């Protein structure tokens, strides 16, 4: 199977991001993950559990949102949003992972934070999220990312990548999995290629045959 190159966005440092002018908006999101020694069906290693969420608009993304830099630091703004969607979890500058400039007409710098939890702590976050203020409103539920690929080369991570993601969320997921050494680059590219091929075939089925 041919592979697809993992897409890249322009990465800048936190310091560079802080020097951007008032014409830029800042979004802050958190990737919470835990090592998972479990096996699916007793034979497929789970390796890690990563949390994402289904949003009100039907798109997948990481917990977080926009931060108004006039009133909040990045971390304070992020924690404020997380409190509405997850509960009492608080991240710090030590959890900062990356900043990327988004493509398109809107000038947005996307900041990603990542924290490794124990599997028990991750499960506690899932339980807490159900009782948060935004559950069932802006947040429709947390999901765990399947970081495995089944024998058909589509089930698992490739199928997950075939979903619709908000803004830079899909790229941030791929970037974090790579830089945190959670999945080799070639495996990421293979999964992305399988997802792209699946989407292409689905689109071909919807389009009328050319005369």
UniProtKB/Swiss-Prot annotation:
Signal peptide: none annotated. It comes from the Eukaryota. The record marks 10 as: Required for interaction with TP53BP1. It is found in: Nucleus. CDD domains: NUDIX_U8_SnoRNA_DE_Nudt16. Gene3D superfamilies: Nucleoside Triphosphate Pyrophosphohydrolase (3.90.79.10). Residues 118-205 are annotated as: Interaction with PXN. Its main location: nucleus. Keywords: Isopeptide bond, Nucleus, RNA-binding, Ubl conjugation. There is a cross-link at residues 10, 151 (Glycyl lysine isopeptide (Lys-Gly) (interchain with G-Cter in ubiquitin)). One of its GO terms (molecular function) is snoRNA binding. One of its GO terms (biological process) is negative regulation of double-strand break repair via nonhomologous end joining. Key regulator of TP53BP1 required to stabilize TP53BP1 and regulate its recruitment to chromatin. In absence of DNA damage, interacts with the tandem Tudor-like domain of TP53BP1, masking the region that binds histone H4 dimethylated at 'Lys-20' (H4K20me2), thereby preventing TP53BP1 recruitment to chromatin and maintaining TP53BP1 localization to the nucleus. Homodimer. Interacts with TP53BP1 (via the Tudor-like domain); interaction is abolished following DNA damage and TP53BP1 phosphorylation by ATM. Interacts (via the cytoplasmic part) with SDC4. Interacts with TGFB1I1 and PXN. Belongs to the Nudix hydrolase family. TIRR subfamily. This is Tudor-interacting repair regulator protein. It comes from Mus musculus. The lineage of its organism: Eukaryota, Metazoa, Chordata, Craniata, Vertebrata.
């Amino acid at each position: 199977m041919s592979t697809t190159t993992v897409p890249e966005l322009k990465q800048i440092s936190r310091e560079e991001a802080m020097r951007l002018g008032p014409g830029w908006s800042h979004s802050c999101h958190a990737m919470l993950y835990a090592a998972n020694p479990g096996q699916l069906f007793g034979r497929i290693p789970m390796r890690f559990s990563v949390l994402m969420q289904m949003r009100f608009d039907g798109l997948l993304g990481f917990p977080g949102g926009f931060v108004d830099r006039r009133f909040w630091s990045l971390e304070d703004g992020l924690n404020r949003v997380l409190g509405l969607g997850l509960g009492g979890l608080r991240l710090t500058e030590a959890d900062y992972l990356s900043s990327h400039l988004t493509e398109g007409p809107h000038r947005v710098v996307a900041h990603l934070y990542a924290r490794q939890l124990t599997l028990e702590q991750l499960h506690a976050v899932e339980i807490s999220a159900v009782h948060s203020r935004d559950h069932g409103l802006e947040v429709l539920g947390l999901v765990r990312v399947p970081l495995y690929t089944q024998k058909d080369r589509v089930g698992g991570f490739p199928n997950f990548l075939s979903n619709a993601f908000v803004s830079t969320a899909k790229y941030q997921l791929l970037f974090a999995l790579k830089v945190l050494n959670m999945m080799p680059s070639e495996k990421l590219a293979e999964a992305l290629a399988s997802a792209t091929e699946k989407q292409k075939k689905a689109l071909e089925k919807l389009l009328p045959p050319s005369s």
